[in-house]
Structure formats: structure tokens, C-alpha cells
Amino acid sequence: MAKKITFNEDARRGLERGLNTLADTVKVTLGPRGRNVVLEKKWGAPVITNDGVTIAKEIELDDPYEKIGAELVKEVAKKTDDVAGDGTTTSVVLAQAMVREGLKNVAAGADPISLRRGIEKSVAAVSKALLTSAKEVETEAEIAACASISAGDPQIGDIIAQALEKVGKEGVVTVEESNTFGTELEITEGMRFDKGYLSAYFVTDAERQETVFENPYILICDSKISSVKDLLPVVDKVIQSGKQLLIIAEDVDGEALATLVVNKIRGIFKSVAVKAPGFGDRRKMMLQDIAVLTGGQVISEEVGLKLENATLDLLGCARKVVVSKDETTIVDGAGSSDQIAGRVSQIRKELENSDSDYDREKLQERLAKLSGGVAVIRSGAATEVELKERKHRIEDAVRNAKAAVEEGIVAGGGAALLQSGTSALKDLQLTSEEAVGRNIVRSAIEAPLRQISLNAGLEPGVVVGKVSSLPQGHGLDASTGEYVDMLSRGISDPVKVTRSALENAASIAGLFLTTEAVVAEKPEPKPAPGPADPGAGMDF
């Protein structure tokens, strides 16, 4: 296919038009008085949202150069969302401001490479200043305040704070749709996986249709168990100990399963068999996690262990096990804390080195099951449109709160970026050409506050001047129009969110400014429709 090639100023301006179209759509959502954007869907109800990355993903432009410009900015929003879970609109506003100022300077003859270097050094200085001024998040109330701002709802903020208090920052907080109104929180203690009992005859609590064991042994095997003679030696040892047995294996069937069921029905020996969670290599990893958590070993021929030779010291233990039709929960495994910490550290390293979103999600789940726990927030609403919008807001707020716990918080509403940034840039030593890059960043760090003011119906220039003269940490509460101590009012942003937004915006601005040519697909003319059949639709 033929290509269109554009050079110099024309190329950069084409990209900028696409950036501006996307940024102007997204930035109306910024701040407590930001508006929503309605997104049409090919199927089903439209989506109403104020989430920057969701809006950005939906924007497709006709002009090939504008399309490329918009795609570059989408990448800023997506990267910020991936790293910090929020701040997507802020990152787009910052990118637009940097590109606009930068292109003016390039058009006036500034060296793009020096500009880029100046921008990078300035952003590094501002990021360092933000981290230095950060306040650690310690109390449940502080976490709730952070989550409330992201979700725009204090009740959601309180529920997220409770969830993180229970499961810790490594724990998993998932958001599910509910058939009822309101928002509920459910906490799962211990490790839970989505495999239930292999036979309903194992049930010990008929009312709840669950098998509940106190202090059972746990047999973990990575192969299929069909023969009763393989299972009998270890079962005999467990019977002599007077305890119950949970069997986790690739599968349990045939005479092995029948024998366990018969012994349970006759009241001779209580046990329950479940399939191992996951598939392939992930199954092996999860079995190893269960073994570490319960203080047992995976009985596998790969490590020279056979089921018929298994002894009680190879079995795991837990304070309580609950098995339902669909899932198994192991509470308070007897594994050593050192081994669990080592396993957690290993998974964390894998998480850092993983590029796949799917793998990262699964590793995060494993990490949570070992180190924290799982909290489920169930959200309901009157209509499907409201339900989807509410669920999305809660997911963003969860990630925002986790980011706050990780690196701390700074004053929100664009105040920290403006105040910390201005003082950091004042002391920065740069060459005369790089100093132009500093001026671009100095102008850009005002942009979020300007947009928040504009969306609140205030005069941006007046607000920026006022906030610049206020003490560190004071700023504009855009919901009331008052100038207040932001942190004491609960108006805060996680440092990770603000820092990621600034760094990602600077990265894309540098690419824009150093672009000298753009190669795009040349749209093919659509073939003219053929002549209509004169006899079509007539009966003969």
C-alpha cells in the first residue's frame, strides 16, 4: 500500500492536531467539577465515564497524521493507568501543555534535542521533589480520603479503606457486579481457589452444602490418583492420627474416590478430594504455593516422591479448611513464616520481570493469596449503564489507594505539582538551551490546576497566581472555591500517580518535539458501487 510522508513543521503540527482533539475531549473530566463523557457502543447501552484512559481508547480519527498523534497520547494515558491506576487525565493535560509550548520553541528555532534533555532533567528534579515532600499514608482515614477523591464518593472510599486494612497492600481487591443496590465488602481469609469437592458425599455441613474440617492434614499431589493401593498407606497413617484429610491432586477418580466416599458415608474416616487449581506450569506453581503455605510438600515423581511412600511429615496442615461445590479455602496454613516470605519474594521478582498483563495479574493473585488475602467489593446500581460506570470508578479508586499506600501522598488539586515543581526548577543548573526545556516544564506543571479551575468555572490565571503564593500544601478546593490546607481537608493525590503522569507526559512530549518526518498509510479510494440490477425485486 502507498504511503504519505510529511516533513518538519507540517509533520509535527499534524500530530499536534490529533493530540489536541483527544486531550480536549479528555480534559473536561478533570477535577471535582469535571464533566462526564458519553461513549457510544456498537452493541448495548452507551457508557458514561470520567476516566481518561477509557475515553482515550474510544477515540479514532480519520486523518492519518492526527490518528498517529492521538495514538501517542493514548499511550501516555495507558502507561500511567498501568503503573498507578489513576492520573490518566492529568497525564494527557500535561502532555498537551508540554507539546504546545515545545512546538512553539522548535518553530522559533530551538534545538529539539537540547529541549528534550532539558525537559527530562527538569522532570527528574520535580519527581524527586514530590517524593521528598510526600507524607506516608498510615491510617484508614487517610486511605479512605484518597480513594474517595478518585471514586467521587466517600462511602466507596470507606469500603476500599476497610478492604486494604484487612488484606494489606499486597492483597487483592476485586470489584464485582451485584444484583442488589449499594456496595458491599466481603473478605476472604487465607488462600482460596476455584475448585470444589469431587463428590457431594463429602459434605459435612448439609445446610450450607460445605465440607468444614478443623486442623486437618493436607495431601498435595501433582498427579492423578485412581488406585486405592497407592492412597491406602497414607490414609492409614492419617486415620491413626485421628485427623481428617484434604486431598488436592490433578484428579481423584475410580476406586480411590469410591473408597474415600464409602469411608465417609460409613463414618469410618472423613476426607474430601478436590482437583488442583490452574493448568500446566501454573498448576505446578500454585501447588507449590499451597505446600509452602501449609508446611507440606508436593508429592511428585519429578522430585523422587511417590504417593505410596508418603509419610505424615510430607503432608501440610491448616487451622481450618472449608470446601464448597465451587471453591476451597485454606485458613491459617501451618507453613513457616520464613519459607512463605521467601516464596513471596520470589513471586515479587517474577512480577517485576513480567511483560504480560495476564501473567502479572495471575502473579499478583498468587502473591495476595500467600501474603495478604482477597477482598471482594460488590457494587450494584439501578441501570446497567450506571452499574458499569460505578464499577469502573471503584476499580480506579482501589488502584489509587494502593498507590497512596506504596509511595505516600501529596496535596491534591494540582497544588503539589505547582509548588514542589516551582521550587525544584528554581535551583536546577542547566545550559542555556536546556533551560528552555525547564521553562516548558514550568509552564506545563500549571496546566492541571488551570484545567481544574476552568472546569469549576473559575479564572485559571487568578487561581494559579494565588496558589503559587500560598504556603506549601495549601491550594484550591475546587468543589467549594475556597483556598485551604489540602491534606487536612482530605484532598490528596498519591505521589506515584502524580509522578507517573508527569514522567509519561514528558516522555511523549520529547518524542513529539524530536519528530522530523511522519510516514502514514495513504487511504485507498473506495470503489464506486456497481449499477443496480434493473430486474431486482420483480416477480416474473
Swiss-Prot record:
One of its GO terms (cellular component) is cytoplasm. Its EC number is 5.6.1.7. CDD domains: GroEL (cd03344). PROSITE patterns: CHAPERONINS_CPN60. The keyword Cytoplasm applies. Its main location: cytoplasm. GO terms for biological process: protein refolding. Keywords: ATP-binding, Chaperone, Cytoplasm, Isomerase, Nucleotide-binding. It is an enzyme of class 5 (isomerase). It is found in: Cytoplasm. HAMAP family: CH60. Belongs to the chaperonin (HSP60) family. Forms a cylinder of 14 subunits composed of two heptameric rings stacked back-to-back. Interacts with the co-chaperonin GroES. Together with its co-chaperonin GroES, plays an essential role in assisting protein folding. The GroEL-GroES system forms a nano-cage that allows encapsulation of the non-native substrate proteins and provides a physical environment optimized to promote and accelerate protein folding. This is Chaperonin GroEL. The gene is groEL.
